[in-house]
């Protein structure tokens, strides 16, 4: 959970200090995501990041997971992410991490910049997350469970 709350703290610092120059990587990711996907306005991206800023506060995470009996089963869970809004697949990824499993993610081609920023942040700050989260570059193969969101087209990953 510290991995996740650490990202929430990064976002809180980014937005509360109004000193965005202290995190040029996040500033660049926001700009790149807006340029890459014309459906993602800067306002939509900022709103999504602010949403996750609140949801990834340590107390909010603790309240959320306290309702569940979590078991560390260590499945390899493939997460095929939608890209219809900024960070659409982040909830699924967070659920995999919190439940004690490993994630192999296939970011949507429409929303890979922000998701990749999240994963790279975790990998840099917490090197042990390299064993927990993998970004797949090819068609997914070796997994125990799968979460697929998006349209009916998502089914094509399984044919």
Features from the language model and the residues they span:
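Acidic-enriched, low-complexity/disordered segments with a strong bias for Aspartate over Glutamate
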Residues: 17, 32, 59, 92, ...
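N-terminal Rossmann-like NAD(P)+-binding subdomain of aldehyde/semialdehyde dehydrogenases
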Residues: 1-78
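Conserved NAD(P)+-binding/catalytic subdomain of aldehyde/semialdehyde dehydrogenases
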Residues: 76, 125-159
